[in-house]
Amino acid sequence: MSNYKTVFFTLGILQIILGIFMLIPIFVQFFFNEIDSSFFGASIITIIFGTLFFLSNLDHDKKLNLQQAFLLTALSWLSIAIFGSLPLIFSEVNFSFTNAFFESMSGITTTGSTIIPNLEEMPKAILLWRAILQWLGGIGIIVMAITLMPIMNVGGMQLFKISNSDSSEKILPKSKEIALRLIYIYSGLTALCAMSYKILGMNTFDSITHSMTTIATGGFSNYNESIGFFDSVYIEISAMIFIILGSLPFIAYIKFLNGNRRIFFSDIQIRTFLKIILISILILSIYLFLDKSSELNFRTVLFNVISILTGTGYVNAQFDNWGGFPLIIFIGLMFIGGCAGSTTCGIKIFRFQILYSFVLNQLRKIIYPKGIFVLKYNQSPVDDKFTASIISFIYMYLVIFFAITALLSLTGLDFITSISGAATSISNVGPGLGSTIGPNGNFYQLPDVSKWILSTGMILGRLELFAILVLFLPSFWRS
């Protein structure tokens, strides 16, 4: 176990931090006179376990090798989901372990699926804790995507190694400094979002919790009707702006602050992300114009395209009733996802860009067999091994999606619930389709085994598949 001292030392720190965050809802309990011992007890247990891990591994190696990085990534999310479920289990609401773990995993992976049937009846402390989990999950995935994933060579993420920044730019600071700057930017955007919500009519509690789940593109709300509860076009506009800000690569914010004022216009991933939003809105608007019987309107089209593409999962309408064509568009948007290095999920735009260029080059080679075609991304050549990694990722993404769909159907779920549940879990979106898990539904009525399958899909999708799958290879443990 000495090889893994660094892993458990870091896990100890993360658990102590999580335990400290558990103390925050206690102040809300006092304010709303909902006092119980659930959060205090959960905090003490979490901090004790974290302290034991921390103190028993003080002699750890200061460096983290590749094997340890994979193990730390998987155990971090799993342990936070487990300990994050404790306040729910200890609460007077009496969550079962399955339901509490599902809600916690949905929170920390910023999925946004919920097993709570009546959110309005929940204690404020639990609503705040759900928001905190999503907020922590959002910043956690940003830091991991920028500092760990490129080193781990997962699904083409090595394209975003910090050392590969453009030579015309200043050399970026080291990983620790980058992580701190990311936290400052993330916190600043959250504060701005909260202020905008407050100004536009939300009460203080709602503005704080919704700002946390907006920037994290998580989608947890305090109401069954989600953001539609407020029935405010101005709140929805504010939400869309901050969802988009949370969906951009956070390294771009650092580059912007370092002096690259054109980064948001020059980055091909950002440009494509915005084009997908505009094209999707245009297609659905044309459909809206031609199909007079549709319940669509431009406001709901605009909001739900942005919400679904980014994996946020906020809804302002029951999009189950919009007909088959819009639902096909939305399922496609679920798979596409947002930008790498942001809080969003899905396959990610850069992978589709490279896959498109790869297919285009293959077609050119058919026409010009002797031609030499170099695949490029953001004006830089892309090595064949990166392309192979991306193709492998997309292949496994689809395989796991169909596997989850099949497993869910074996638990007795209907086809629509199974296929949309698989899509929303692996893409970390939140709502599915159908009368049970649709936009204003929840996952409470699903069998426990279905919830465990979906929870597995959530962590697989959040951690880019291979960061989990590699742990099941015997050769990984022998390396």
PLM regions and their residue ranges:
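Membrane-proximal intracellular helices of multi-pass ion channels
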Residues: M1-S479
